[in-house]
Amino acid sequence: MSLISAVEDRDIHNIGKTSGGGSRTSSINSSKKSLKHGSKSLRKPKVYQTTGEPLSREALYKAKLKYGVYQSPAQSYSIGVSDAHAASDKAANLAHDNQTTVEAYKRMFIDPNATKAASKMGPKVVRNNSITSATSKTSKESQTKRKSKESPGAAASKAYSMTMETTSLSSQTNSRSYSITSASSVLSGASGSFNSTVNPKPKTLNLEKVLVGAEKKAESRIKERWEPEKTNFQYGVKTDEHGNLNQFSFSNEMMNNIMAKVDAPKAQDLQKVKKVSAEKEAKSMKFALGAANAVKDMHPGEDIDKSIALKAQKRETYLSQLTSQQVLTLARANVDRQLDIIEKSDMHRKLFTNMEYNKAAVAVAQSNHQKKTEFHNKINMGGGLFLSPEDITKIASGLISPVLGEVSERAEAQRAMDEEIAERTEAYNKSLNEWETMERSIISNDAKVLTTTANRHQTEKKTSQEKIKASFDALVARMDTKVAERETLLEDTKSKEIEFKKQMQQELKDEKARLDQDLEEWGKKCEQDITEARKEQEELLKPYHDDLANAEAEHKTLVEERDEINAEISRLQDAIVDHKRKISGYGNDLDAQKNRNIREDDKLLELGQTKESLESHLNDDVIILANKAKEQAELSTKEARLKQLEVDSLINERKSELNATEIELKKEKLNLLEAMKDVASARGDDKIDEEKVKKLIGMTSEEYLTQNKSVEKNVEDLPTQLEKIEEGDELKKEEIVGAETKNSGGDGVPVSTAAKEATETSSAVQTKEPEEKISIGNKSSGKEDANDCKSAEHSKEISVSQKAGNNKSLGVSPDSLEHTFSGFSQGSSIEDDQDAISNQEKK
């Protein structure tokens, strides 16, 4: 059994949908007709015919209509709500925006039964159309046009089929251009129609003012109902349904269109077309008049015929009297006034003043509304069965949707496959045809190209040969003339060349004699300048040579001192090894003495020896400890001395390297000065450029010579200062040695205290790190031997001699050597020497 009843083709547009025009009548009548057809058995749509060919589009469309594809609940609109899924929201919005009392008046359609009832109840009016023949003709034409253009959207105007049609006539007369004959006819027709009766029933009372006020009041009430005041609150989801309902308003223009049985846009279009046609006609007449005036005299030089001129003047005066503007305005005002009177006389025939018509329309609307409420939001399924959209969707999704989906999928797949096969075959055939045509065109083009190229080559060959021959002849003639000109020019140049050679030989002889004389004078002058420059060079380089000799001597002394220090280091290392060996022997003796003391203690306890024998044994132990402490002190002093000598050797190596670099620098300086002198002598200058010397050396040559003289004086005074320092050191050493001999001589000091002091000094020496002057501190403690004093004196003499040797040529104040080449290194070494001398004097 099919759940969707079959529908005839003529009733398809009336089921489940509203009409496309302004009237939205219900589809109950059409659905009742469809109920007569019984339910038919469901048949699957055949996509292909028995012969295997696919169905046409029309057959597929009818099959889908038959099986309800286009009338499915998901696609069709219900009677009550357009979208069944959003029925609750739309119902809430409609209830809020449009009240039920207003909804009846807001309907943009009227039931045909209501219009028929209103038309029957209204009185029929007999119109006297005796204005003019032209107006009656236009009224008939307008009636026929309106009947042909009448649409379902203008159903409300059927009730006024017998009303007057002067509104359209007034619009036509206003838009058209007036002429003399039309004005006269209008005046005559209007004078005759003033006495005619408009209505069959005579009016006893003048209710014009009452009717006008009632009409205004009714319009204001209807406007309040049509466009109620909106509140500030909302319910539910807002939609645009209310906007679609209020897209029309019953204004005066709309009412005039309803009375004319024409829709608003169509009436506007008609008016626009009439205006455009009138403008075109006026323009054409204007252009024709201008053309006639322009062509009336083809020969402007000839005189105009007097009879023609008089006729034209009479015609102009006559037309000016007949078609004056005042006459036309008066005629137009009279016509407009009469038309307004005619329109106002039919007030009882208007829509809102006809109470009987409104009552009949409301009664029909209420009856239709009661019929609709029974099956509200339900769909007629046939056989008196009405189902809601939800039930239909459930049934369709459970039974019909899968089958239809599978059928449609297979049909679409097969159709797509057939289309693809057809496209492929068509494309293949097309490409094959194109390829064949291309091959044929290539063969024909090749044959044509060969013939054309051969002919073209022959013609080009002939033309090129002719051109080459002509150009060759012209070139030969041109070259012959040039050769003749060049030969004459060559003879002239040869004669000029002989004269020029003679002149140049004489000039060369004179120039050679002059240059020989200048060369002799210049050679004598250069020899004199060279001798003077050499003398100046020797004077300038003398201090540099002296500095170089002093630096080389200083380098030799430093090398000798380094060798002596290395020999002293090797000797001290041997002594340290010897002392370590002795210390190990003393340690063994101490261990043996401890064992002996233990044995002696046992013997004293056993035998009870005397006090003297015990003291003698104790004194031996103390002596051994003192000797051990002494050896340790000697070892520490010699290690300190070794480190001091290593430091001195490193210092000497650095100084020797510094002196070597200074020597190289001085040599380079001398080479630079010699080069500068050579350059100056080559240029012929008497002196060296002092500015360049100042940039390189830091001072001029004269300042450098005076400074080197002061340095030499300070170097001469340096040995006397060193001798005084050495004498003071020797006196201090003698005092230290005398004090040590007194302490070692035993001036009432016990041996045990000396041993303790020796151990304390040795431990202090071992804990402290050796510095550069640790030997002097150990000497001042008064706990060292005479040999150590001698070695210290020897080392001090070596250091003093080293410093004296290093500073033989540079032992001056740092201010005097501030601007020399090696001023930084020399000044730093001099400051170190002065610090060492001051420390020794303080001690």
Curated annotation (Swiss-Prot):
Primary location: cytoplasm
Residues the record lists as Phosphoserine modifications: 2, 88, 130, 182, 401, 584, 710, 763, 775, 816, 828-829, 838
Modified residues (N-acetylserine): 2
Residue numbers spanned by region Disordered: 1-54, 120-176, 717-843
Bias type Low complexity, positions: 752-764
Disulfide bonds: none
Protein name stated in the entry: Eisosome protein 1
Organism: Saccharomyces cerevisiae (strain JAY291) (Baker's yeast)
Gene that encodes the chain: EIS1
